[in-house]
Amino acid sequence: MSNEEELILDYYAQAYRLEMFSYRMMGKLLETDNVHNRLKKNNITELYIYGGGYLGVQLYNVVKPYVDVKAIVDKSGNLSVNVKGIPVISLDKLRTVYKNEKIIITPIKYYKMIKKELVEFINEDNILYLGEFLEGVI
């Protein structure tokens, strides 16, 4: 196998792992009792959700009955899916309105990059990764 073929195979293996983890997280979000228990365990009463894609919108729908979801945060200030009635703000807006609430990061592929931006103005203890929130793992 050539180096180029190995790189392509590695790329597809990584993409497959990300897709499988996303699929597992979507399944975990269907376990509403678990989600409610995880909210209690993490003492979450107010929350921002980072990521306007499927995982962010699904998390919003599941936690909304239990906590005050301030908004979904997306760098662009828009949802990636067409859903009405969900408050969405940009990262720049979050910088001006944030008041020590928890934030759960839903984009799996870009978690580290997003966290790096958030720790500039948010205490690291208030930032959770979706996998960490749902399963206690990063």
List PLM regions with ranges.
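Hydrophobic, well-ordered beta-alpha structural blocks that scaffold small-molecule cofactor pockets
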Residues: 2-138
